[in-house]
Amino acid sequence: MPMYGDLGNKLVQHAKRTQNLTHLPPYQTELVRAVTREVRDLDKDVASLLEPFQGSFDPSTDQATACTLLVNHLSMRRNKRCLLAYHRTRTDKLEELVWNGSDVLDLAGQQAGGVNGAAADSGAGSSLSPQEEDYFRQYGDLLSAYKGQWTDIDLTGSLEPPRDLFIDVRVLKDAGEIQTEYGAINLTKNSQFYVRQGDVERLIAQGYLQKLG
């Protein structure tokens, strides 16, 4: 028999798995709605239990009701914490993806092209909820405005200095033509290049290129 908090615990498990992934899994729309609905139902139960007392409830005179109220209150509080933890984890992952230079359309394509089972659970064609897509775009705009103050510095670049100035890379998916210090390169799938690492770090982070060796 399901107990209060079981659905919230599932959200926490999803959040824990998300922390170990390089992408963002589908948003659990139905599960979030179910947890929210449980909180509202518990709140209605609390109001119904307290209604006969008209604001004069004394826990010491009705310990059974007091116990029920305590369980309901703690269950609501736990569910809210689970909801906050789930959404905070996804928000942190979204911000990480923005700093890595990922595109919101790439995120939307992860589900359509990959995890069909998870797509059925979320009932949407994107890994993100509409609110997350909006947050992603707005956060990206803020980051662009922030970076614009220091045009000579790539604030989203790696904090570790490269060990090799030039590296061999393989193109995993078409990325079109890019401009480097030594000229233009047309990145077509399965082709290989010997390039300056600083010119392609972002493309490696985005999954377009694979560093060889």
Swiss-Prot record:
Signal sequence interval, chain numbering: none
UniProt xrefs under SUPFAM superfamilies: GINS helical bundle-like
Pfam families in the record: PSF1_C, Sld5
GO cellular component, one term: nuclear replication fork
Subcellular localization: Nucleus
Keyword field: DNA replication, Nucleus
Domain of life: Eukaryota
Entries under InterPro entries matching the protein: GINS_A, GINS_bundle-like_dom_sf, GINS_Psf1, PSF1_C
Any Gene Ontology biological process: double-strand break repair via break-induced replication
Subunit structure as annotated in this protein's UniProt entry: Component of the GINS complex which is a heterotetramer of SLD5, PSF1, PSF2 and PSF3.
Biological role stated in the UniProt entry: The GINS complex plays an essential role in the initiation of DNA replication.
Family (UniProt): Belongs to the GINS1/PSF1 family.
Protein name: DNA replication complex GINS protein PSF1
Organism taxonomic ancestry: Eukaryota, Fungi, Dikarya, Ascomycota, Pezizomycotina
